[in-house]
Amino acid sequence: MSNIPSELKYASSHEWIRKEDDGTYTVGITEHAQELLGDMVFVELPEVGDTVSAGEDCAVAESVKAASDIYAPISGEVIAVNESLEDSPELVNSDAYGDGWFFRIKPSDESELDSLLDAEGYQAVIDEE
């Protein structure tokens, strides 16, 4: 069973989002998602300054098994990307909720967070797969 931290919010498409102290949000993929994908070999990140909409594909995680689109859980402006993933995509596998984050976003509509899942809701999504 995958680790699902209770302090995060989740999208049914297997992204997590965490609010930071400065009001921005960090986005990554869940431990469950990286387990399904297997060993990461390449990550394509959005550009800093990109504007993304909730549900829009904005990054790609490529593993030995498949390439998978990564979706923005909320709308906003990309303010940082995890450049460490360019040289070390395996961080997504080893630390999905920490050093394996994908990008940070400055939200344009925080009410979109209300449509995301809590840990229990995300577990239910996994159980239905």
From Swiss-Prot:
What SUPFAM superfamilies does this protein's entry cite?
A: Single hybrid motif
Q: How does it assemble?
A: The glycine cleavage system is composed of four proteins: P, T, L and H.
Give the UniProt family note. Answer: Belongs to the GcvH family.
The family database entries (CDD domains) matched by this protein are listed as: GCS_H (cd06848)
Entry-annotated residues carrying N6-lipoyllysine: K65
Give the protein name, as stated in the record.
Answer: Glycine cleavage system H protein
Residue ranges the record marks as coiled coil: none
Q: Would you name any one GO CC term? A: glycine cleavage complex
How does the cofactor attach, per the note? Binds 1 lipoyl cofactor covalently.
Q: Does the keyword Disulfide bond apply?
A: no
Q: Is Cell membrane tagged as a keyword? A: no
User: What InterPro entries does this protein map onto?
Assistant: 2-oxoA_DH_lipoyl-BS, Biotin_lipoyl, GCV_H, GCV_H/Fam206, GCV_H_sub, Single_hybrid_motif
Cofactor(s) named in the record: (R)-lipoate
Sorted keywords for this record are: Lipoyl
Query: Tell me, what does this protein do in biology?
Result: The glycine cleavage system catalyzes the degradation of glycine. The H protein shuttles the methylamine group of glycine from the P protein to the T protein.
One GO biological process from the UniProt record?
glycine decarboxylation via glycine cleavage system
Span of domain Lipoyl-binding: 24-106
Pfam families attached here?
GCV_H
